[in-house]
C-alpha cells in the first residue's frame, strides 16, 4: 500500500551513514510508517540515468512519487539537473539564456565543436555529469581540447563532454526557489586566480540581492525543470 515502513540509521561525524553489521551493537531507532498525506521527502543524490552509482535511490524515489508522495525535488527535476546536456536542452526549449554550448561525442569532433563556438579560446570543457567543480576544465587551444577529450574518453568511453564559451566574471549566483517563490540568493566569488567559484573548491559565499532580471530569469529557469 501507500503506507511505507521507514528505517533510520545514525550518521557519523564525517556525515557517513552507519549501517548495521553482524557484530554491531549500536542502537537504532525503531522503524516508523509514513504516508503521502503527512510526509514530505527531501532527496539528495538520488542517482542518474547517465551514471548508475546509487540509481536504486532514484528508483525508490520514483516509487514514492508514483504513490503520491511529494518529493523535493521531483525525480524528473533531478534527472534534468544531474545531466548538464539534458539541462541545456531543456533551457534552450524554454528560451532560457545560457552560455553557448556544444556536445562533443569524440575527439575527432573537437575541431568542429570549436568552430561552432567561433574558435574563441579560452573555452570551458565539462563532463555532463559532475559537481563541485570537478570535471570542469580550462581549455586554451585546439590542441589541448583534442588531447583532453581523448584522455576523458580513455577513462570512460561513454562520457558525454560539453564545450562551452567562456564568459569572464568575478562571481556566480545561486538562487533558492520553492513553489515559484524566491527564498534567497548567494554570490560565490571566483577563487583567486582560478576560473571556478565552487564553495567546495574554496569560494566563500556571501548574501546577494538579485536584480529584477536575475530574479525573473531564475524563476523561469526553475519553472522549466
Regions found by a protein language model. Give the residues of each.
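Active-site nucleotide/adenylate-binding loops and adjacent lid/helix of ATP-dependent enzymes
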Residues: 67, 76-162, 170, 212-213
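Conserved residues at the C-terminal ends of beta-strands
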Residues: 44, 104, 188
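Conserved N-proximal alpha/beta basic substrate-recognition cap immediately N-terminal to
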Residues: 2-100
Amino acid at each position: 500500500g501507500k503506507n511505507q515502513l521507514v528505517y533510520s540509521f545514525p550518521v557519523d561525524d564525517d556525515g557517513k551513514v552507519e549501517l548495521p553489521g553482524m557484530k554491531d551493537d549500536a542502537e537504532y531507532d525503531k522503524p516508523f510508517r509514513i504516508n503521502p498525506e503527512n510526509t514530505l521527502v527531501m532527496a539528495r543524490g538520488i542517482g542518474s540515468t547517465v551514471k548508475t552509482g546509487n540509481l536504486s535511490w532514484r528508483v525508490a524515489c520514483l516509487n514514492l512519487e508514483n504513490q503520491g508522495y511529494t518529493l523535493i525535488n521531483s525525480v524528473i527535476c533531478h534527472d534534468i539537473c544531474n545531466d548538464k546536456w539534458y539541462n541545456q536542452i531543456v533551457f534552450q526549449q524554454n528560451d532560457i539564456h545560457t552560455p553557448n554550448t556544444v556536445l562533443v561525442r569524440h575527439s575527432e569532433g573537437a575541431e568542429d565543436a570549436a568552430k561552432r563556438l567561433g574558435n574563441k579560446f579560452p573555452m570551458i570543457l565539462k563532463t555532463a555529469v559532475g559537481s563541485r567543480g570537478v570535471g570542469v576544465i580550462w581549455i586554451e587551444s585546439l590542441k589541448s581540447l583534442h588531447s583532453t577529450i581523448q584522455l576523458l574518453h580513455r577513462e570512460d568511453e561513454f562520457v558525454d563532454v560539453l564545450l562551452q564559451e567562456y564568459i569572464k566574471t568575478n562571481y556566480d549566483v545561486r538562487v533558492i526557489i520553492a513553489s515559484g517563490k524566491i527564498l534567497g540568493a548567494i554570490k560565490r566569488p571566483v577563487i583567486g586566480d582560478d576560473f571556478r567559484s565552487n564553495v567546495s573548491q574554496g569560494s566563500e559565499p556571501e548574501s546577494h540581492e538579485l536584480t529584477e532580471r536575475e530574479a525573473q530569469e531564475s524563476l523561469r529557469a526553475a519553472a522549466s525543470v
